[in-house]
Amino acid sequence: MVVYVTLRRSVKNPMKLLLHACCGPCSLEPVRLLRAAGHDLTIAYLNSNIAPADEYAHRLATLRAWAAGEQLPVIEGPYDPAAWEACAGRVGEAAHDPERRAARCRACYRLRFEEAARLAAAQGFDALGTTLSVSPYQYTDIIREELERAAAAAGVRPLFEDYRPFYDEATHRSRSLGMYRQNYCGCRFSDAEAAAERAERKAERAASREAERAAHAEERAAAEAAQAARRAERAAYDAKQAKKRAVLKALREQ
């Protein structure tokens, strides 16, 4: 039977905790909260999903630079994109198929959590947690299921918490610290999906601006037409008055 731990209960039971982390910005609030609960933390960077390799290294460097200032140990696991492709990459393209996309992410979580759980058991950690649940763009329920599954198989406790309420604060803090903030989850599929979503939003904004310009053009055309009508009306009135004055002048001169 899995002994399930939450942040609220763990205040009375501080543990030696291995915290799987995907990047620096997503670690800020989970680390703050877990330390406040009294846990002894070590970060595990196990993310073979991240592509390309330069992106993987950039995120790791950002995480390590911040963790060093926090006196927080960071363990880097093996970077094995081929293993990730065999496990999660085989699910394939899924940008417009929510079920396949969720299946791909589940396989990705499973691979990384299994690696982290084995590491936690081998190095004598009491429990395993993750920072993935800080993001509102992740599958939180699946994260919880896979974390519990991996921890149970390795004989360590799962410590899950839904950190999404702290996402805005994590965003604010990471920007204030000047941290590198990636614009996609990590894998090559998410990179393409995020790019497509950004392009779609850009197109929507452009269409909105064009519609606004068109609406303003119609308003300007209507205003100009009204002004022209007023000028024509004034010109007709002036001509009529001039004609009256000419008639009166002719009568006076008779």
Task: Name these PLM-found stretches.
Residues 3-254:
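Nucleotide-activated chemistry modules centered on ATP-dependent adenylation/adenylyltransferase
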